[in-house]
Amino acid sequence: MITLSNSIHLYARPDTKERLLEFFTSMLGLEAVASADAVGSPEPMYSFTFANGASLSVEFTQDALSSQQAQRGAWLELRSDDAVGLQQKVQAFGLKRVVHPYTPFFYVQAPGGQVFRIVASKEK
């Protein structure tokens, strides 16, 4: 049997660091934990643990994709008990809406370029 883990690692450019950390902490209510795994890295990696146990880490490097390039990377999904409220909150935060030409879903681009779909916890 093969399964997909619930651990994600992203790359983002250093100039997006403060705003991206603010997105995860202020907008999503997560704690940013500096990782001890980044031995020799000029920038610390940060990890975030979600309510369902999923984890996401971010590494800041100049080699990360641009925001435009990141739109062609993996798109992630955030599930919320108040999806509409979170959608409004991230738009007020200034995140860019991303429109997929073939789906009706709500997508935003986080600082750093990653695209997130925001859905209700009960959606499939």
Q: Where does each model-flagged region fall?
A:
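Alpha-helical scaffold elements within enzyme catalytic domains, especially in hydrolases
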Residues: 23-26, 89
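Conserved short beta-strand elements that form part of the metal-binding/catalytic scaffold
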Residues: 31-70, 115-122
